[in-house]
Design a protein with these regions (language model features):
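Nucleic-acid endonuclease domains
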Residues: 1-83, 101-234
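Conserved catalytic cores of phosphodiester-cleaving nucleases, focusing on short active-site segments
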Residues: 64, 88-101
């Protein structure tokens, strides 16, 4: 379980330490990191919005796997479970994933860091639009099972993938709540350049933070790119 993962993380860092002081410092750093994670993890199950966020990230992971991208690189680049601002970071390339209803497509940004390209060579935004369906679709559970199957050839990667799911708050005991079905309608890809409509930290007055806002698709049409461009750059 997630607490075993926490202890394992501490033991691994201690094993890599050369001196007692180094071991103590690393242990304190690990505890601090995990405290922040525990504060954010929803142990009571994922909300609908959290489920949709995870579905979007899983759709992108499957897209990359289906395009023969390195499974190891994909897992290492998946920063969403660490509650970082970007969902994926491949070297200097950041990727933010969004999922919304196909009936009223819009991009919801939850904080000023998500579209901030500081310290990145390039930032992309991918938007998936879905429709609620009764049958012939996929659920969060079925998408996770599909993804696990693709990682099943490597036991270590499969284990790491399951650990990342736990960090996001996905636990087996809540599976019955994750059978809502969706159908993928369309996906959009954008290059988040300097002129892309967004709010970033440097634009905000002192004391203002955690800004949440929506972007209309019509406002970002000129920033559209082909998904192949993203594939080539990561």
């Amino acid at each position: 379980d997630i607490f075993s993962l926490f202890i394992q993380n501490i033991l691994e860092d201690i094993a890599e330490s050369v001196t007692e002081n180094e071991a103590i410092t690393k242990t304190l750093n690990v505890i601090s990191k995990w405290k922040k994670l525990f504060d954010k993890i929803n142990f009571n199950g994922l909300s609908i919005e959290q489920q949709k966020g995870l579905i979007g990230e899983l759709l992108f992971i499957n897209h990359l796997l289906d395009n023969q991208k390195s499974s190891t690189n994909i897992l290492n680049a998946w920063t969403g479970p660490d509650f970082e601002d970007k969902d994926f970071v491949f070297g200097g390339i950041g990727i933010e994933i969004k999922l919304t209803s196909s009936k009223y497509p819009k991009i919801k940004i939850t904080n000023e860091g998500q579209l901030d390209s500081q310290n990145l060579n390039r930032l992309y935004l991918i938007l998936y639009t879905v429709e609620d369906v009764k049958e012939n679709g996929f659920s969060l559970n079925s998408l996770i099972e599909q993804t696990q199957q693709k990682f099943s050839a490597n036991i270590d990667e499969l284990k790491f993938f399951k650990e990342r799911l736990m960090l996001l708050g996905y636990f087996e005991e809540h599976k019955d709540h994750y059978n809502k079905m969706y159908s993928l309608k369309k996906n959009y890809s954008y290059s988040v350049s300097e002129k892309f409509p967004k709010i970033i930290k440097s634009q905000l007055p002192i004391g203002v933070y955690n800004t949440s806002y929506f972007i209309e698709l019509s406002a970002v049409e000129n920033f559209s790119v082909e998904i192949e461009e993203i594939n080539q750059n990561i």
